Amino acid sequence: MNLRPEEISSIIRQQIDKYQAQIELTDVGTVIQVGDGIARVYGLMDCMSMELLEFPGGVLGMALNLEEDNIGCVILGPYKHIKEGDTVKRTGRIVSVPVGDALIGRVVNPLGQPLDGKGPVNSDKYRPVEVIAPGVIYRKPVHQALQTGIKAVDSMIPIGRGQRELILGDRQTGKTAIAVDAIINQRGGDVICIYVAVGQKQSTVANVVQKLTETGAMDYTIVVSATASDPAPLLFIAPFAGAAMGEEFMWQGRHVLIVYDDLSKQAAAYRELSLLLRRPPGREAYPGDVFNLHSRLLERACKLDDQFGGGSMTALPIIETQAGDVSAYIPTNVISITDGQIYLEPDLFYAGIRPAINVGISVSRVGGAAQVRAMRQVAGRLRLDLAQYRELAAFAQFGADLDKATQARLIRGDRMTELLKQGQYVPMPVEDQVMSIFAGTNGYLDDLPVEKVLPFEAEFLKYMKTNKPHIGETIRRTGQLKDVEQELHAAVEAFKKEFKAAHGLE
């Protein structure tokens, strides 16, 4: 094959004509100090707050302090190889996470990277972890119930879609159990659940994921995990990452339940970062803006107005108290931000009353408007009666002579306390709750021994499903009791006679 010189020269000329020098501008800075997961970077004058920065080895950092002559940056990964004088590049991106249906059923870290060994998350849509919460114009009052399946909660401390309900108590009092039960109870419904584990042991998170998988709840749940061994910055952004994932569904007009387990560990991680960044400490050494940290997170949970899709995000933040002290800094902050709180008491827990809810200081400030009407009818005075019963029971311990009305109240209180006990991972449908509490508040249990209350409930609900299924169906469909109230009275009376005869209580 012969190549003529003029052909070669013409090809070279064409290549030269097509050549364009592409100049790429990269904003770079220099590490001037590094240690304890914090880097001080000089030279990135146009850097944004919460922007991702790239360190050598592909490790990412997040700009938190924007000062006159340098940037305080937290490193989101291993930092032993980073040293003074290293080059840092801007990415131009605020910290963002993948969002959408591809995340459902997955366990991811706060950056959206998978932890479950099921391959990459196939989502091409991202949302920044920090956004401003929807304003008043976008919102609608809470009016739809979110059933947790827990009798004590749905009857006395009802939660509505778009509400923020705090769960607080000492360690090992059943806080996570209430949240996980609420997630399991959404099975078969239209609610997507997000469980954000902050600063937990890996074994604890694995147990929760296993239980959600066994009950089929992972089919509609996302787990965001930042464990105790992860760097503090990941613990700090984990709740925000979960909120961003939930907002995507909320703005699509869907309903989300998000659990932050727990925010006291996020506050501790934020305190660690703030002190390392030399921010001035305040009460209990927390930075001055720790209230803002939690308020801007929890304000993102809301019920959207119908013109914006009518979606909702319900938040269940969890706070751990120390020796029952609800007046500490972080608990009081979050109590004032949320729409109510469920307080779990160690004494009740150890007495076998589980869930160990102290009805005296637990409250739902907006959930009453969302409560199923049938439940409101049967449980209207239940919370007040139980709170009074606790006071009377304490008084009766002194052996004082009690009048008949007080004795009747103590008898009723004993049986209602027993009736509200419930095992873990066995949420109850709302129609069963209504029928069960109906029997208690109408005095049908008053002449039964306390130890027979739960067997009575189990057999009664079985009897209703077998012999009178239309009553439960009517309550579930209409949410009202008026059409079946007389029939329900008759059914309880008929069953009670059978129960007494079978158990030799005549």
From Swiss-Prot:
InterPro entries: ATP_synth_asu-like_sf, ATP_synth_asu_C, ATP_synth_asu_C_sf, ATP_synth_F1_a_nt-bd_dom, ATP_synth_F1_asu, ATPase_a/bsu_AS, ATPase_F1/V1/A1_a/bsu_N, ATPase_F1/V1/A1_a/bsu_N_sf. It is found in: Cell membrane. Produces ATP from ADP in the presence of a proton gradient across the membrane. The alpha chain is a regulatory subunit. The lineage of its organism: Bacteria, Bacillati, Bacillota, Clostridia, Eubacteriales. It catalyses: ATP + H2O + 4 H(+)(in) = ADP + phosphate + 5 H(+)(out). Its EC number is 7.1.2.2. GO terms for cellular component: plasma membrane; proton-transporting ATP synthase complex. This is ATP synthase subunit alpha. It comes from Pelotomaculum thermopropionicum (strain DSM 13744 / JCM 10971 / SI). The gene is atpA.
